[in-house]
Amino acid sequence: LFDAVRVDFSLRRLVHYTGSDWRHVQPWILLTNYHRYVDQFIKWSLAQLQEQNAYQSLILPGDIVIKRGMNAEEAAALIAQSMWHRFQMPAYHLTTTRGQGVTLVNIGVGPSNAKTITDHLAVLRPNCWLMVGHCGGLRQTQQIGDYVLAHAYLRQDNILDDIVPPEVPI
């Protein structure tokens, strides 16, 4: 699917952008552009590490590892050490014993970051990636917190015009 040069380039870019070794990236990937989802992912991940399940560690940007069974004070100290702000698109990896965990990448602002990170993640052949927390507006029937599945993209930013003609809907 990808030649060796492209794979090597993308793996190195993943480390550069996310602050994590590419080997930590899990096959189920969430992308977000809101830090509050990072906070919730960390909180949820820490709770998962306290339960009996397949999750074994949470890896933060800078390859900081929080392991199953670690007490709350130790985990909080490690979270505080994370230099996530040094990376353009910091990634957080909730790992399992069989490599079927979840990675969350905070892509920040802009479709160019989304394109960049997905281009580089593609060489890992993930099972799925999904953008969460990105909604341009609500209908009268919706409330804050409702699940929204985006199915369209307004082409007013001109980012993809050279690749996909503007008359083609995305």
Give residue spans per PLM region.
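N-terminal short beta-loop-beta anion/metal-coordinating cradle
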Residues: 1-106
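Glycine-rich phosphate- or other oxyanion-binding loops that anchor nucleotides, phosphorylated ligands
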Residues: 28, 69-170
